[in-house]
């Protein structure tokens, strides 16, 4: 069993159950999935950008990404419906916990000028989204072999019903959220 999964079952679940007064263990919020998304507008000019971004995504997530396509044509962005414009990966179960461990302990501390994650990035239903500007914060990506610095969006979906429950869950996992008072 994955380290964070064990932590969740043995310590986080009883703590949150007591804190929020849940009657059942199944009512305690848990992680559902983590979604990584890379929007690649520059793929319009160079089709190889998608392949290189997919290679980075495979190294980071350990799973093959799904290519996302433009839904409709947009003259302002010079794209047509059906053109590839990004890639995404959905992580669940063991891979999700492995990725979360690497994100919390390795990748986030390597972000330049990092002072904590914004507590305002919750969506109202306990899910948290964050953006990473450089994919090189992950140790799997070798700096010398990177053709371009690309960012990505990471969304952590939980079963929490409120932001407060989601915040307590992520704090218990060791997420470096800033205090709301500042």
Swiss-Prot record:
HAMAP family: Ribosomal_uL5_B (MF_01333_B). This is Large ribosomal subunit protein uL5. Part of the 50S ribosomal subunit; part of the 5S rRNA/L5/L18/L25 subcomplex. Contacts the 5S rRNA and the P site tRNA. Forms a bridge to the 30S subunit in the 70S ribosome. The keyword Membrane does not apply. Keywords: Ribonucleoprotein, Ribosomal protein, RNA-binding, rRNA-binding, tRNA-binding. InterPro entries: Ribosomal_uL5, Ribosomal_uL5_bac-type, Ribosomal_uL5_C, Ribosomal_uL5_CS, Ribosomal_uL5_dom_sf, Ribosomal_uL5_N. The lineage of its organism: Bacteria, Pseudomonadati, Pseudomonadota, Gammaproteobacteria, Legionellales. This is one of the proteins that bind and probably mediate the attachment of the 5S RNA into the large ribosomal subunit, where it forms part of the central protuberance. In the 70S ribosome it contacts protein S13 of the 30S subunit (bridge B1b), connecting the 2 subunits; this bridge is implicated in subunit movement. Contacts the P site tRNA; the 5S rRNA and some of its associated proteins might help stabilize positioning of ribosome-bound tRNAs. One of its GO terms (cellular component) is ribosome. Belongs to the universal ribosomal protein uL5 family. One of its GO terms (biological process) is translation. GO terms for molecular function: rRNA binding; structural constituent of ribosome; tRNA binding. Gene3D superfamilies: 3.30.1440.10.
